[in-house]
Amino acid sequence: GDVYTDPDSPVELEPIEIDPPTLAVVFEASTSPLVGRDGDIVGGRQLKERLMQERENNVTMRIEELEDKTGIEVAGRGILHLSVLMEEMRREGYEFQVGRPRVLYQKGPDGVRLEPWEQAVVECPNEYSGKVIETFGNAGGTMVGMEAGQTQTQLEFSIPTRGVMGLKTRILNVTHGEGVFYHTFSEYAPVTAELSGRKNGAMISMSTEKAVAYALGTLQERGSLFVGPGDECYEGMLVGERPRPDDMVVNVARTKQLGNQRSSTADIAVQLTPPRTFTLEEALEYIMDDELVEVTPKHIRMRKRLLSETERRKWAVRHGLVKK
């Protein structure tokens, strides 16, 4: 930029360097069966105009329309940076959907593929430090510093940006909510080994209906739920997580079959565990390549890109993921 200074005694200031974008997501017009229920700005043209306006005013983001015109790619400095824009837009009344964040790679002078790395710091009670170190190791991180106090330990790591995605939730889990985790961009370095994504399969709604307590009571025995009684669900929407790696299509609206004879347990209310809720950041970190986050002024939902189970199966067969 320009420097304004005294012409008689000019002082030249060093230019301010802006960290390069490290992650990108694609914004698309919502294709949800519930589109238009919460927001009044749902069109693809309106979404494009809003993001192009953001490009004019926000120099820290790189915003480009995809060649096939199916969406707008927005690149920023991490998931928090991107989620701030999404939060602003949902408050303005926009409804849209975004895909899984992808890491932006670079090529070094010798042709080596480079990826963004981050410096991460975790502060946690001493008894959880071992679990934190193990969690970072599984995510491709390396511990570079450690300070142990009487009750708290501060751990410093170097970790690829790919490994950071989803790490905040895991750190909170292993520290029982007592860990403090923050990270910042460090450098571009050679790509390390491939990292695995989410290991748990999803429960996927088979129809567009409101969730029923009886059905949820049965499903919570098979995993954790993302919805509660009365919540609107639709075919292809993620409604829970199961401990096994494969997905399972479920009926969230199944009701109890009533017989002629009264059972001694017929009137016992279903005891449900409160559903697991997600922030925008957590949802973006959670989804896989074949999933999307639906963003509205009132809701954050996760869904399959292909809503129909039949379409998902056809796609899997075409790509050799399952046998015919």
Locate predicted features:
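Accessory interaction regions appended to the cores of large information-processing enzymes
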Residues: 1-324
